[in-house]
A protein has these predicted regions:
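Bacterial N-terminal signal peptides
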Residues: 4-14
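Generic detector of short alpha-helix boundary/capping microenvironments
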Residues: 7-8, 25-26, 91
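Short, intrinsically disordered, charge-balanced linker/junction segments flanking boundaries
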Residues: 14, 18, 129-131
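N-terminal carbohydrate-binding accessory modules
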Residues: 18-71, 101, 105, 109
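Aromatic-lined substrate-binding rim segments of carbohydrate-active enzymes
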Residues: 57-130
């Protein structure tokens, strides 16, 4: 149940690759996740947008989809976004919104793990400077 609640709060559900956006209902059923009332299996791949040059984001997402994945999991690496206390950078290579929109264009869902700790062999676990 805890995992289900965590997923409910951290999943960003996107529509298909078409331009129109549709609201989805994601919930935990008795023995399965439900998307719009139908059983849904999360088939997720982990991608670290900070480790992939922005020019390759689309290709990597396509590769995940080709492997049968329907979801991309991402961490937010706070030590990249807040290199100086109180000053945040979500531009260019650090543009989480652009990465998520790109996943949406490929018909993928995204699970965002905001941290602050990152369990991905990352310096200081991704904690922002000054911690």
């Amino acid at each position: 149940k805890i995992i289900a609640l965590l997923v409910l709060f951290t999943v960003i559900l996107f529509s298909s690759a078409q331009a129109q956006t549709t609201a989805h209902k994601f919930e935990a059923g008795k023995n399965t996740f439900l998307l719009d009332g139908k059983p849904f299996v999360v088939k997720a791949a982990e991608l670290h947008y900070t480790r992939i040059p922005q020019a390759y984001w689309s290709h990597r997402i396509e590769m995940c989809k080709a492997l049968g994945m329907n979801t991309i999991c991402i961490y937010i690496f706070w030590n990249i976004h807040e290199q100086e206390e109180g000053k945040f950078d979500f531009s260019g290579q650090n543009d989480i919104a652009a990465f998520c929109k790109l996943a949406q264009q490929h018909g993928m869902y995204v699970i965002v793990r905001p941290g602050p700790y990152v369990c991905a062999e990352w310096e200081m676990g991704g904690l922002p400077c000054g911690c």
